[in-house]
Amino acid sequence: MQRSPLEKASVVSKLFFSWTRPILKKGYRQRLELSDIYQIPSADSADNLSEKLEREWDRELASKKNPKLINALRRCFFWRFTFYGILLYLGEVTKAVQPLLLGRIIASYDPDNKTERSIAIYLGIGLCLLFIVRTLLLHPAIFGLHHIGMQMRIAMFSLIYKKTLKLSSRVLDKISIGQLVSLLSNNLNKFDEGLALAHFVWIAPLQVALLMGLIWELLQASAFCGLGFLIVLALFQAGLGRMMMKYRDQRAGKINERLVITSEMIENIQSVKAYCWEEAMEKMIENLRQTELKLTRKAAYVRYFNSSAFFFSGFFVVFLSVLPYALIKGIILRKIFTTISFCIVLRMAVTRQFPWAVQTWYDSLGAINKIQDFLQKQEYKTLEYNLTTTEVVMENVTAFWEEGFGELFEKAKQNNNNRKTSNDDNNLFFSNFSLLGTPVLKDINFKIERGQLLAVAGSTGAGKTSLLMMIMGELEPSEGKIKHSGRISFCSQFSWIMPGTIKENIIFGVSYDEYRYRSVIKACQLEEDISKFAEKDNIVLGEGGITLSGGQRARISLARAVYKDADLYLLDSPFGYLDVLTEKEIFESCVCKLMANKTRILVTSKMEHLKKADKILILHEGSSYFYGTFSELQNLRPDFSSKLMGYDSFDQFSSERRNSILTETLRRFSLEGDAPVSWTETKKQSFKQTGEFGEKRKNSILNSINSIRKFSIVQKTPLQMNGIEEDSDEPLERRLSLVPDSEQGEAILPRISVINTGPALQVRRRQSVLNMMTHSVNQGQSIHRKTTASTRKVSLAPQANLTELDIYSRRLSQETGLEISEEINEEDLKECFFDDMESIPAVTTWNTYLRYITLHKSLIFVLIWCLVIFLAEVAASLVVLWLLRNTPFQDKGNSTYSRNNSYAVIITNTSSYYVFYIYVGVADTLLALGFFRGLPLVHTLITVSKILHHKMLHSVLQAPMSTLNTLKAGGILNRFSKDIAILDDLLPLTIFDFIQLLLIVIGAIAVVSVLQPYIFLATVPVIAAFVLLRAYFLQTSQQLKQLESAGRSPIFTHLVTSLKGLWTLRAFGRQPYFETLFHKALNLHTANWFLYLSTLRWFQMRIEMIFVIFFIAVTFISILTTGEGEGTVGIILTLAMNIMSTLQWAVNSSIDVDSLMRSVSRVFKFIDMPTEEGKPTKSTKAYKNGQLSKVMIIENSHVKKDDIWPSGGQMTIKDLTAKYIEGGNAILENISFSISPGQRVGLLGRTGSGKSTLLSAFLRLLNTEGEIQIDGVSWDSITLQQWRKAFGVIPQKVFIFTGTFRKNLDPYEQWSDQEIWKVADEVGLRTVIEQFPGKLDFVLVDGGCVLSHGHKQLMCLARSVLSKAKILLLDEPSAHLDPVTYQIIRRALKQAFADCTVILCEHRIEAMLECQQFLVIEENKVRQYDSIQKLLNEKSLFRQAISHSDRVKLFPHRNSSKYKSRPQIASLKEETEEEVQETRL
């Protein structure tokens, strides 16, 4: 960044903002880069400002019982704020004085007053000087106030961030990220813009008093008629404002519904295409858009009347002020002109400045109070510790996540009693408040000596993470004692990476020790990974470490914890993302050897780790189930240990599976003194596990990648969803967010008893900060969010490091920091995260305007209609002027002219009544025309917005995946939320305002030019100067605005990153470093914003200077060239003053239109995306010349009838090559094989080898070359939709959209209820659907959060059965399933798809056994394609993956199927829980 010229600028340069000239020149000539921006003055740096405010706030906290943030702000900024307020007032006073001089000038032309004629020229000079003084006072004052507003915002931003880092975990659970971002963005932006208006709260009343005094002198009591009308008008506008808010609130709900479905569609676009649901989704979204647009139109009409009321009020104010006086006493022209000028200023003060100022104060004080409350929230306290202590001790420790739960618990119980809940009802329910009453840990005791390893195991949600939080001081014990030495290092369960290099992430502010660093890297197996990067350990990781795989992130997090020299190491499930082999090696080399003499507490679920630990603590529902050594465990709890030991290769399971089994086992053995309990009782019992939910609610412990939150299980009455629903003041969303749950708990919930919680389920929930820290991100819940699975930017990772999940969720993989807003509040969030879809020019092109205008044929007619009405108004005025000029002199025909719509006012001394009748008649006609000029325009522009939305939606749905893969989900969603909101709300009225203002100016210039042709000569250069100046300024200002938006994103991204790693930050004491980083991000944004404000002021001042010159010219031309007659001079000068303020407004309005039209440019960019249907897939020859031949798709006769093709499901694949994006690396190369009808083929390969990619290629979702035939029909001889309908798909990431069960199973409404129920029976879904009220009409929300992962898989299965597909593609259907659901899916597959071709990508051995052929993919190619016997005989991947004992088990299958074309699948014995095993290769 360059040094700012401001530092060396002279006073004159600062006054006229000339110091910004170099940047304006540069921006006009070339594209601005960040390096071109000037550094901020030291007075504006976040460090200085935050220190100043923090000091005053601390003083306030220390000195008072009720500290007020406004007092601290006052002490920091009051005097400068007052100084600029006085300048502003003096500038405004000049406005009030100008009409006096105008009156004197007009009076000097009265034939009876020749004595004053000689001083007219001096009065003219005085009038011009007032304009110059006003310009020199107002602009520095407004800029100064904007500057103070900016400084206040920066100081408060910093204070909020510092406070966030100190908040206790209890408080963090009550605040959602959405609220925090809203606190920073929404509330604080009010200061930037609003502070300039704040002073009008006292300036406007003073101005009104002064003006009323001056008008009283002219018109006596009748002056108050005009004022009365203005006050009534202001109240009328307030009423309209309230009505508008009502419509907007109603509309917000509709927008929400549309955006929820749109976001679900965008996030699951791959599934939408695979299912051929494009038309169904389009129809669904368009229907929601229709109802939304009805309310949009109502709100727009109200806003239109509100806006036009201001324009049309000018005539009435003058009319009502003058009429009573004229009727009683008659009137002279000088008074009328002076009154008109006074009334223009008066109207501005009463209807605009004062209401805006009141609104600003209301908003600002509200924001300050919110921030004040936030700054007084409870902070976390580090535990008191003793450095001489060597052991770690916990004595009788009990802890709650909530405080004050007792009272709430009582209230909930009382409420339940009132509802007369029967005790013997099997469907027990608990409210979220009963959860509050459950301690997360109770009576925990243990003691470990220095150098010992304590392994903590337990059921899902038993309190394992909470135990570590207690030791770190994040959770305060309500009773009991904790002792340790205080030097702690911590590794979080969810690996957290800060922006920076790998080295910085590991050292993390601790002093650098080369030997220690190398040892740690070796022990954590990072050497090989680091060597792959060209920059080695200096490679920079973006937000969230996006260039890394989950395993690499986990190892870096562990390395960070190990590198710090501490007495106690807390390791919270550090091996979650690692494969079995790596985990074993790291456990040995790192935990057992490198840290052998350190005290370690390891949360784990592996038997091997328990065996090696010095002590074991097993937790269940917050209590200690067992504490002691492994041998004691075998002696004291023989049932439990033998149960776990009885699993073959328990440690080989994925961590999710292990936890599922562990939870179930603990449940069974912990009931009623370990007495044997029947399965049905276990089912019942599972509803009582409030402890599990209580802990789960907070920590989402052992959450899988796609974890979701469940509601409390409740009785069938929807009202009882929350125990104390009606009486609680706490908002509903707060309580609903409390219970996160993960897929792994599924095995525990009885399959049939997911009770529905009624319509209230549809209330939006939001995610607390604490949930986000523990990664519990809801599926499909948030609008501004990506899937958690894809936290890595895949395009940057070497191909070998891609995980299956990466590849499958490729299109969402490039998001940054958007998984954050759980309440859909796009107003708060849309501005916070900049999406870099900004490859559009800095200024909107004419082509965009032309396309926009011609989009709807009526729009051109409406614009012509506006012009015709305008010409009628000007013509009427000119006719009246012509009549006036030809009136005999003795009648003293005089005329006045009202500001806005060219109404001519004729009043004579002799026939006041008669003339007023004519005047009112003409004015009313023009008024009616004027009113209806705008309505058709606003109506038509909203229709244009509707067309744009429809075209864009269609384009996105029809775009090829290769195009969508290059876009961010957040970027696409911003088009549908932010840009469509601009097209609906802001653009129509801004265009109307601009056209209105432009016509007023043209009309005024026309009238003045008719009266005094010389003045026309002065207006031509003025308008030319204004057009050139605007073009010059726009180039730079739009680029600065763009840079400012880009600069805003890092602030919020940093906030989110800090919150995710807050526990790590605090454990390592790195808060000061992160505050510095935050201040850097703030300063970068400030530099852009300050420069934007300065250039804007430069522009406004130049415009004002041009008008001052114009006014001087007009004044002297009219004074020197006009002969007798007050009328002409009066009209000319009044209009010239008018032209000045209106044209400035018009210029600003034109800049607004240009900014808003950028949204239209972005929407057009999406509309112009290529479509999928036209993409040939044959071989490269077909489209070498880049031209797409429509002739290529020839309707194939076999496909004419849906029931004929495909009949058998035979597939032939020839030379298939697949890429994600055009010109990218080939993920699969020259794949060739064939599949017989009805055959089952298993895909094998390492993670990231391209198994899921192959399935996507079959569906033509990728850029493919080569050929595939199904039953002899080639894929480029039929349409894309027909091809995809041949396949049934069960993807890894299940897509459930917001809608009824029926809609989810059959979005095109092709099947009757009877057929749907029949299929539901086949796949085992009937019992699930029947649990819900409304059955098939029950509405699923939030990605089907009330369904388990298994139920969702069954939904996919049902869709495939309904589609009558002959080929079924399964992508890891059992990834997160418990044994029970898995059996249901296996059974359904055997029955419903007995004669279908099945292609299976799976990690479980027993699922693979049912396949006749196996395709082994390695290094993007087919390595082997053989039967299971051949694979077991050779040295293949499959053989390596299976242990010797398993091979012995499998032999019977091998031998029996040797000579059969197809084994008897039905004869395979059902697997028991113990036989489930993973084959992650």
Curated annotation (Swiss-Prot):
Gene Ontology biological-process annotations: bicarbonate transport; cellular response to cAMP; cellular response to forskolin; chloride transmembrane transport; intracellular pH elevation; membrane hyperpolarization; multicellular organismal-level water homeostasis; response to endoplasmic reticulum stress
What residue intervals hold the motif PDZ-binding? 1479-1481
Instruction: Give one Pfam family, short name only.
Output: ABC_tran
Reaction catalysis annotation: ATP + H2O + closed Cl(-) channel = ADP + phosphate + open Cl(-) channel; chloride(in) = chloride(out); hydrogencarbonate(in) = hydrogencarbonate(out); ATP + H2O = ADP + phosphate + H(+)
Q: What is its EC number?
A: 5.6.1.6
The chain residues annotated with the modification Phosphoserine are 549, 660, 670, 686, 700, 712, 737, 753, 768, 790, 795, 813, 1445, 1457
Compartments annotated for it: namely: Apical cell membrane; Early endosome membrane; Cell membrane; Recycling endosome membrane
Provide the residue span(s) of the region labelled Interaction with GORASP2.
1387-1481
Q: Which residues form the ABC transporter domain?
A: 423-646, 1211-1444
Lipid moiety-binding region (S-palmitoyl cysteine)? 524, 1396
Position(s), cross-link Glycyl lysine isopeptide (Lys-Gly) (interchain with G-Cter in ubiquitin): 688
Keyword field? ATP-binding, Cell membrane, Chloride, Chloride channel, Endoplasmic reticulum, Endosome, Glycoprotein, Ion channel, Ion transport, Isomerase, Isopeptide bond, Lipoprotein, Membrane, Nucleotide-binding, Nucleus, Palmitate, Phosphoprotein, Repeat, Transmembrane, Transmembrane helix, Transport, Ubl conjugation
**Which sites does the entry annotate for glycosylation?**
894, 900, 909
InterPro entries listed in its UniProt record: AAA+_ATPase (IPR003593), ABC1_TM_dom (IPR011527), ABC1_TM_sf (IPR036640), ABC_transporter-like_ATP-bd (IPR003439), ABC_transporter-like_CS (IPR017871), ABC_transporter_C-like (IPR050173), CFTR/ABCC7 (IPR009147), CFTR1_ATP-bd_dom1 (IPR047082)
Residues reported in the UniProt entry to bind ATP 2: 1220, 1245-1252
Record-linked SUPFAM superfamilies? ABC transporter transmembrane region, P-loop containing nucleoside triphosphate hydrolases
NCBIfam families recorded for this chain? CFTR_protein (TIGR01271)
Record's comment describing the protein's domains = Binds and hydrolyzes ATP via the two cytoplasmic ABC transporter nucleotide-binding domains. The two ATP-binding domains interact with each other, forming a head-to-tail dimer. Normal ATPase activity requires interaction between the two domains. The first ABC transporter nucleotide-binding domain has no ATPase activity by itself.
| Record note on quaternary structure | Monomer; does not require oligomerization for channel activity. May form oligomers in the membrane. Interacts with SLC26A3, SLC26A6 and NHERF1. Interacts with SHANK2. Interacts with MYO6. Interacts (via C-terminus) with GOPC (via PDZ domain); this promotes CFTR internalization and thereby decreases channel activity. Interacts with SLC4A7 through NHERF1. Found in a complex with MYO5B and RAB11A. Interacts with ANO1. Interacts with SLC26A8. Interacts with AHCYL1; the interaction increases CFTR activity. Interacts with CSE1L.
Q: What does this protein do?
A: Epithelial ion channel that plays an important role in the regulation of epithelial ion and water transport and fluid homeostasis. Mediates the transport of chloride ions across the cell membrane. Possesses an intrinsic ATPase activity and utilizes ATP to gate its channel; the passive flow of anions through the channel is gated by cycles of ATP binding and hydrolysis by the ATP-binding domains. The ion channel is also permeable to HCO(3)(-); selectivity depends on the extracellular chloride concentration.
Q: What is this protein called?
A: Cystic fibrosis transmembrane conductance regulator
Question: Which species?
Answer: Callithrix jacchus
